[in-house]
Amino acid sequence: DAVMDVMLPSLREERAQSYSPFLPLHPKTNRVMQVSIDEVNRSRGSIIWTDPETGERFESPVTGGHCKLQWKPDWAMRWVALGVDYEMAGKDLIDSVKLSSEIARTLSGEPPEGFNYELFLDEKGQKISKSKGNGLTIDEWLTYATPESLSLFMYQKPREAKRLYFDIIPRMADDYLTFREKYPQQA
């Protein structure tokens, strides 16, 4: 109930009508079911739901691997259960971090310290997207340059958006070698 009290105000009205932090796994197919919950049985720690294809009703315990959590409550639960004390997230997830932090406190836990970073952009300044294929993978970078050059790229100005594209690799590799060469003279 406490998690629902945090989640419901963040949802559109239509979504709030059917929302549950728990997604039951179908006992016959093991599929994650995105269904409305018909009833909550707190004494047994279970939810009752109806298979939309067959009309069959099931009661699923919310523990023991019988349910999956929706991602925002899941994030908070992991923080609390695993004692996570530091979490990085892209700026596009700031609101989700705040919501998950509130859920963690509701569960008598402490949310982790955080760091929000800017997103990566392609050479045209557009947000990198896996589906568009306009990005560069770590493996691709490491095919052409060292892990240290990648670290230099990642840790320079972490709160600024970075353009990540192939032509940046040689520049970062050269910059790393230059910094490494000059370090003894500056130390």
Model-predicted regions and their roles:
Residues 92, 97, 118-187:
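Catalytic adenosine-cofactor/nucleotide-binding cores of aminoacyl-tRNA synthetases and other
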Residues 2-138:
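Active-site cores that bind ATP or allylic diphosphates and position pyrophosphate for catalysis
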